[in-house]
């Protein structure tokens, strides 16, 4: 099994605000789909609830939701109590962890790959991406190499890929 993490963050690390994502970036959504399609995704309950209903469950992916609420059932997803339970349930597949902040913190020590979209906006937030210390993580790709793409929404962004050293 391999554990990969994926998130979009502002330049100062914000990934969430008020239970949602503080930007709309179709290019990031397309990349997320391309990377995770056909693989299981693991998320916390709040992340699940932040998804628009029409995307619950995320199509083409086994959806696993972490929740401390005993007996919680969500249509189209499997609910487990912990990240360890999720990984045991999923077996040998590549698993994508997609949030939120607490789940990223739990999964980061197990991860071998992180895919990041850096969004060039300043936003207020209440949830941050974990740090990727340079002695533990190596950037393997940046698109573009220098500077930013401009999204269809006039938002600057770039894609970064990291692997564990």
Predicted regions, residues:
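Enzymes that bind and transform nitrogen-containing heteroaromatic metabolites
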Residues: 1-165
